[in-house]
Swiss-Prot record:
Swiss-Prot/TrEMBL keywords: Cell inner membrane, Cell membrane, Chloride, Chloride channel, Ion channel, Ion transport, Membrane, Transmembrane, Transmembrane helix, Transport, Voltage-gated channel
Gene Ontology biological process: response to acidic pH
Gene that produces this protein: clcB
Any one GO MF annotation of this record: voltage-gated chloride channel activity
UniProt protein name: Voltage-gated ClC-type chloride channel ClcB
Organism whose genome encodes this protein: Escherichia coli O9:H4 (strain HS)
Amino acid sequence: MFRRLLIATVVGILAAFAVAGFRHAMLLLEWLFLNNDSGSLVNAATNLSPWRRLLTPALGGLAAGLLLMGWQKFTQQRPHAPTDYMEALQTDGQFDYAASLVKSLASLLVVTSGSAIGREGAMILLAALAASCFAQRFTPRQEWKLWIACGAAAGMAAAYRAPLAGSLFIAEVLFGTMMLASLGPVIISAVVALLVSNLINHSDALLYNVQLSVTVQARDYALIISTGVLAGLCGPLLLTLMNACHRGFVSLKLAPPCQLALGGLIVGLLSLFTPAVWGNGYSTVQSFLTAPPLLMIIAGIFLCKLCAVLASSGSGAPGGVFTPTLFIGLAIGMLYGRSLGLWFPDGEEITLLLGLTGMATLLAATTHAPIMSTLMICEMTGEYQLLPGLLIACVIASVISRTLHRDSIYRQHTAQHS
């Protein structure tokens, strides 16, 4: 057991450096090509001319598509192992290392050029990849899946600063595949990854800065639960839209470079209306949490961002969908909160409260992982007073969504982009 905990610590350290490496590569490319050193793609888009704002996501998609197509032709004659940690965990615990690195590089290109896709997906993949490399060299074959799971959880902890949520994501999503007894090493890896990531970044700040002064009362619990019901209905709708967009892009029968470029061009067109559509949505979420906008502004940005996410994901852009889902959930919750705020004196606090609730419940509705979703929002914001209400609402959202749509967003996205 001591040996496993020691290996889990090493895996956590490797995962933290893998995530940091991807993050610094992003910052370097943004500085080189966008002249942006703020770390915010929304700021980068704001400072670009309309033509560059329009074409940059398309060019990034084109470059990523050419890379993926070239690699596919180069390796046409050899057998392929999984390039995703979920696939590796469901098979024999082995990766196609070269293909996974190419996939991560393609993700780096589309993410830094403004596509509305999550950077965290590639970060988690690289963390799992680093864990797999170490495991295959120093551990017996029957443990390989455990260390990939530890790497994925550690990558999630380093990317989102949420070690418990990262650990429980692995447990909830892989329920039946991984024994609960294995959670010890997973948690150790996740916590170590967070600590090392904090040292690398010279910061232990929360992912999102929120000033929620409300004390949760009976009325608020009712609003939180009703938001869970709303998210439970919206989750399957989002999944259906994503699936329909993917089928639409596939039906065009375009070569991968053209398909990804088309997705990027749509994002570029939408960014002419609002630069907030660029990127995974992190900076927009933070700005909404700092000062919730008015109803019509939320609605406008929400519609543009939703279309950008659908275009990026549907075109096959390699990347994650968790963070874009967080923004969509925040916007749905805030739209609901703004509507209710007309009848309550503390409308601003209700909007913020239901925005956070929307983030958690839509994540639960799309991932079918209610405990992870609850803990993730609490860990990212530090608002642990919301935990009881969020847990109830997330379970309700997950049950409703699972009833209406069998597959989670992660399994659907993996099936489409693997």
